[in-house]
Swiss-Prot record:
HAMAP family in the record: HisE
GO BP annotation list: L-histidine biosynthetic process
Name of this chain's protein: Phosphoribosyl-ATP pyrophosphatase
Taxonomic superkingdom: Archaea
Pfam families to which the protein is assigned, alphabetical: PRA-PH
Length: 94
């Protein structure tokens, strides 16, 4: 996976959080508050686990994408950037 798509999606999420456009799923979940977004991360985590154990590869990929998206929204609300995560992963690699 290219970092660029993650970085691009994160920028879109930041824009949606700032502007809160009508019809935006990101704006909708952010308007419900950080606890709601955190619960969505938990829900998507469980769905990813279930897909890995009982479903096909395409379903697993879809659930992982949902999990990553919701993690990015939660990261944005916490002020954590993808670059912060890349640095931490790099640090752990050493």
């Amino acid at each position: 996976m290219s970092n660029e798509i993650v970085d691009e999606l994160y920028k879109i999420i930041l824009d949606r959080i700032e502007k809160r456009p009508t019809g935006s799923y990101t704006a909708e979940i952010v308007n419900k508050g950080k606890p709601y977004v955190a619960r969505k991360v938990g829900e998507e985590s469980v769905e990813t686990i279930v897909a890995s154990l009982a479903e096909n590869k395409e379903r697993f990929i879809s659930e992982v994408a949902d999990l990553i998206y919701h993690l990015l929204v939660l990261m944005a609300l916490e002020g954590v950037t993808p670059e912060d995560i890349y640095r931490e992963l790099e640090r752990r690699r050493k």
